[in-house]
């Protein structure tokens, strides 16, 4: 392919990308200014273009930051919304401790999504760090079960979560990690010096029992990377 042809292809690709971006932004502006306030708020959060000022503008138009049982904040912390948009919702009165039907909260969903910035925003705004879901699992246990290791590590290092936390059935962080870890065992290796290795759940199962069907864990141990 000649150099001129290559440059033409690159120019066309750049033009397509610019057109897609401009079209998306025009759709965002339409949603922000034309749709009903609550619907505009949700569409803007989903679009990814939204900023703190956009959130404030839409709420001034009459959007409820907690409509539909806190759906805007839930959407923000679970998605790829910018940190400033989450701050905008919080500053406009979104309830950071709203409880969803399954007993979870916005902070739980931020943790499960691996969204460390959202976790820090919510915690700074007063979100309860000691909350638990119905089975007694705290934020750290849920993070490990979801393989959200960045947020799990943040909870331990910044907020002092106990690495030996357990739920109502006696399942610990180590047991959850042994069962659910796949490729990233650096978190488990990092935890090991502080872990209680001799604890069992209510059925008498220990971390080895939870990890016996985890071929990834067995492979890492075979390589000598984990005890």
Model-derived features with residue positions:
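Ankyrin-repeat boundary/"N-cap" motif
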Residues: 34-46, 66-77, 99-106, 132-139, ...
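Ankyrin repeat A-helix N-terminal signature
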Residues: 43-50, 75-82, 109-115, 142-148, ...
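Alpha-solenoid repeat scaffolds
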Residues: 51, 65, 79-83, 96, ...
């Amino acid at each position: 392919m000649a150099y001129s042809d290559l440059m033409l292809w690159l120019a066309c690709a750049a033009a397509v990308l610019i057109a897609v971006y401009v079209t998306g932004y025009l759709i965002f502006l339409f949603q922000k200014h034309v749709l009903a306030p609550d619907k505009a708020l949700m569409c803007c959060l989903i679009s990814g273009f939204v900023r703190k000022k956009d959130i404030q503008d839409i709420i001034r138009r009459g959007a409820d930051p907690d409509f539909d049982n806190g759906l805007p904040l839930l959407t923000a912390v679970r998605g790829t919304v910018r940190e400033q948009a989450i701050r905008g919702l919080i500053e406009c009165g979104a309830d950071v401790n709203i409880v969803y039907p399954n007993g979870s909260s916005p902070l739980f969903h931020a943790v499960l999504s691996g969204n460390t910035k959202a976790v820090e925003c919510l915690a700074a705004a007063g979100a309860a760090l000691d909350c638990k879901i119905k089975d007694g699992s705290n934020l750290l246990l849920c993070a490990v079960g979801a393989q959200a290791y960045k947020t799990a590590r943040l909870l331990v290092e910044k907020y002092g979560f106990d690495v030996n936390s357990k739920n109502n059935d006696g399942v610990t962080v180590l047991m959850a990690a042994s069962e659910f870890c796949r490729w990233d065992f650096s978190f488990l290796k990092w935890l090991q010096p502080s872990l209680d290795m001799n604890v069992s759940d209510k059925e008498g199962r220990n971390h080895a029992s939870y990890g016996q069907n985890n071929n990834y864990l067995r492979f890492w141990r075979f390589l000598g990377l984990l005890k």
